[in-house]
Amino acid sequence: MTLSTAQEIIEDIHQGKMVILMDDEDRENEGDLIIASDKVTPEAINFMATYGRGLICLTLNKERCLQLELPMMVKSNTDKFATPFTISIEAASGVTTGISVNDRARTVQAAIAATATAKDIVMPGHIFPLMAQDGGVLARAGHTEAGCDVARLAGLEPSSVIVEILNDDGTMARRPQLEVFAKKHGLKLGTVADLIEYRNKYETMIERISECKLNTEFGEFDMITYRDKINHQIHYALQKGNIEPNSQTLVRVHLQDTFKDILQTGSTRWTLPAAMERISSENGVLVIVTKQEDPEMVISKIQNLALENKETPVVNSQSRQVGLGSQILSDLGIRKMRLLSSSSHLYHSLSGFGLEIVEYVCS
């Protein structure tokens, strides 16, 4: 089955049709039914419940979540994919038990109304909102962001209702089953990676603001400085040597971390100095993605150090930084990467940025 382009997916969303979007095989590799919230009907909810079978969720941007005063479901998200659930909701009026398809459609309508406030919903309920990251799929390659993006690009409220597609036996539907499902129900099937490529072509979260030579203890680098258009954060790329599009470029994307960078905590092989030294000797690119560290997270790290706490760390803080790093690498003309990494961690939907990891350099 030929996959539909992002433009074809967006056109169907604009027309009020349901579509299927798949994510990476190295991520959840699931397919979600998606329909713009503006176009939701009881019949659409019934189709999702009957044939999708997964959890019916409502994707919302951060601005809408603040408008509705929605608290996150948990303070520290330790889910593998950092799925950003808020507390579940129900319409404050016009519903009965809240679970019927009519009630759930009504709840969606109440939540996305232009004048909606916290008084228009109650918590908990039978609709599960998901808060998309600023920047959409360019920041996080998830169905949450994809749902908001396709609706916005279709000229609608940036919100969608989504549900995972399960097989008849309750297992997750993968691409072969999704193709059969799409043909059976006459739905277009696309990918999050293609949506990323589409947005990366016509939109970007970053802009170059300066270029200069930078002398360091590891030699001279070309430093290219970028600005994040959303939060105005500044990021840097240190380049050594020329970049050839068809060559395999040595790359390190370094995410700012106070404890690792200044206090040298943690066991990572590729500290900032180590990465600079390696790239200086072999040529390549070091991208330094900065971030505003949440004071509560810093305090939590300090408390964990004091208690010698060995619990699994929170995993939701890097997805936006990875998206920014990918855009910078793409802007520099990099296609194939030899990635300096402490592990062969899989980064999702890089193909949407025109990037491919050909080797993990762990030592």
UniProtKB/Swiss-Prot annotation:
Return the Pfam families for the record: DHBP_synthase, GTP_cyclohydro2
Q: In which pathway does it act?
A: Cofactor biosynthesis; riboflavin biosynthesis; 2-hydroxy-3-oxobutyl phosphate from D-ribulose 5-phosphate: step 1/1
Name any one GO molecular function. GTP cyclohydrolase II activity
- Which residues does Mg(2+) 2 bind? 28, 143
Entry keyword set: Lyase, Magnesium, Manganese, Metal-binding, Riboflavin biosynthesis
Binding of D-ribulose 5-phosphate, residues: 27-28, 32, 140-144, 164
Residue positions annotated to bind Mg(2+) 1 are 28
Q: Metal-binding: is it a keyword of this entry?
A: yes
Cofactor(s) needed for function: Mg(2+); Mn(2+)
User: Where is the segment annotated DHBP synthase?
Assistant: 1-201
As its record notes, the protein acts as a catalyst of: D-ribulose 5-phosphate = (2S)-2-hydroxy-3-oxobutyl phosphate + formate + H(+)
Key word Magnesium present? yes
Per the record, where is site Essential for catalytic activity?
A: 126, 164
* UniProt GO cellular component terms: cytosol
- Tell me the cofactor note: Binds 2 divalent metal cations per subunit. Magnesium or manganese.
What segment(s) does the record annotate as region GTP cyclohydrolase II-like? Answer: 202-363
Question: Which PANTHER family does the record match to this protein?
Answer: 3,4-DIHYDROXY-2-BUTANONE 4-PHOSPHATE SYNTHASE, GTP CYCLOHYDROLASE II-RELATED
> What job does the chain carry out?
Catalyzes the conversion of D-ribulose 5-phosphate to formate and 3,4-dihydroxy-2-butanone 4-phosphate.
The molecule here is called 3,4-dihydroxy-2-butanone 4-phosphate synthase
Organism whose genome encodes this protein: Photobacterium phosphoreum
